[in-house]
Amino acid sequence: AGVAAGNGRNSKGQYRGVAPDGELIVVKLGNPGGIGFPRTAELMQAVDYIVKKAEELRMPVSINISFGNTYGSHNGTSLPERFLDAAAETGRTLISVGTGNEGAEAGHASGFLREGEERNIPLAVQERQGAFSLQIWTDYTDVIGVALQTPSGERVGPIREVMGTQRFRVGKTELLL
């Protein structure tokens, strides 16, 4: 908020935001409650609220989304990406999305598999990491199997594809699918 609309009062005018006379609409998504799933529905509701409020006030709006996730297809076709594109075309709306600060953590992998081919994809999960989310994107008609192997060598899977939530434990780790 200070970078956007800081008025410089605490620094005797030396440090001010880019729009010190700007007005802010701040929307907090709330506590995720440890469920570990993407909260894109709440994000879309928040953006919708801001765009509608700006239209009501007849003001332009610049929305900064620092959401801290790597979900989605990353090719502009996922529901949240298409929603943000549409929102940016509404009224006088500008949307900025952070590009991440994961550095060299190898949070993404991509590739193609031929029928019958297997591939191991190592995941870097910290020892005390409380939650971890993984998305696998395939073409609609593809059928894949997923198995997990812990650092201790315990293996789970292939995991069956079923509708609804699946919960199970591997050692001390709870998996929520």
Question: What label would you give each PLM region?
Answer:
Residues 1-39, 58-62, 90-92, 130-132, ...:
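Subtilisin-like serine protease catalytic core
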Residues 24, 45, 151-154:
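Amphipathic alpha-helical scaffolding segments
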Residues 2, 41, 45-48, 52, ...:
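Solvent-exposed, polar/charged alpha-helical surfaces in well-ordered, non-transmembrane soluble domains
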Residues 5-10, 45-46, 116-118, 127-129:
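Short amphipathic alpha-helical surface micro-motifs
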Residues 27-29, 47-75, 98-99:
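Short acidic, glycine-rich surface-loop motifs adjacent to enzyme active sites
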Residues 37-44, 74-78:
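Soluble non-cytosolic domains of exported or imported proteins
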Residues 68-177:
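Substrate-binding/specificity loop regions of serine endopeptidase catalytic domains
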Residues 7-8, 54, 112:
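Active-site catalytic pocket residues across diverse enzymes, especially alpha/beta-hydrolases
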